[in-house]
Design a protein with these regions (language model features):
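Phosphate/nucleotide-binding beta-alpha loop and adjacent structural elements of enzyme active sites
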Residues: 1-213
Length: 213
């Protein structure tokens, strides 16, 4: 099995797009691996954006405090909560509420599968179609990292042109409908298009290559 960050480390990357940056811990890894690359991040949760800015993550990436979806404007964002101490792998998780499961989609089966995670609040956040993000117009994307908790189809629906210019795509998926209207892997692959082939299925995440880009 290909270790995803070792795979990324070996690539020549000029432009890296991270969709769903959370606290920016992966962002920091990407910057360490590729100090000269352009890193463009999207994170809609105001709580997470505050953590990123406090840690200075916005100093080494282009941070957009917005969600990516299939429309431009504003959108409802369901904010997760919970005691992350049992699962904490770093100080950021230990010191903050569990915001990792927040989504543009309403949680459904997620509430039964992960009972310790709640969704007590929601927020109206800015949203955009990736195809309409001005700073990425016409840009070749060497690697796109997507972690959006069940809202993958919304991201991809608004990114059809950008995906044609994207060489590698790494996205989370789930074959259970944990969020309302969540698509499974087969449905996501159909939406993304036949130009992407599966390089490695991690069972919850999948690495894809655009064979015509």
């Amino acid at each position: 099995m290909v270790l995803i960050k070792e795979f990324i480390r070996r690539l020549k990357i000029n432009t890296f797009v991270e969709i769903g940056a959370h606290f920016g811990t992966d962002t920091a890894d990407f910057r360490q691996m590729h100090p000269q690359s352009r890193i463009v991040c999207f994170e809609p949760d105001p709580r997470n954006v505050a953590v990123m800015r406090k840690a200075g993550v916005d100093k080494f990436c282009e941070l957009h405090a917005a969600a990516l979806s299939n429309t431009n404007g504003e959108i409802m964002f369901y904010q997760s909560s919970g005691d992350s101490t049992p699962l904490a792998v770093d100080d950021y998780l230990k010191d903050h509420d569990w915001s990792c499961s927040s989504s543009l989609k309403k949680p459904t089966r997620h509430l039964a599968v992960h009972k310790w995670i709640t969704f007590p609040t929601s927020a109206i956040v800015p949203c955009a179609r990736l195809d309409d993000v001005e700073s990425l117009q016409g840009a070749h994307i060497d690697f796109m990292w997507v972690d959006v908790q069940g809202a993958e189809d919304l991201v991809f629906a608004g990114a059809q042109e950008t995906l044609r210019r994207t060489k590698y795509l790494y996205t989370e998926y789930c074959n259970q409908e944990l969020y309302e209207g969540q698509l499974n892997l087969a449905q996501l692959l159909a939406l993304i298009g036949p130009q992407f082939r599966v390089l490695c299925d991690y069972g919850g995440d999948v690495l894809l290559e655009n064979v015509i880009c």
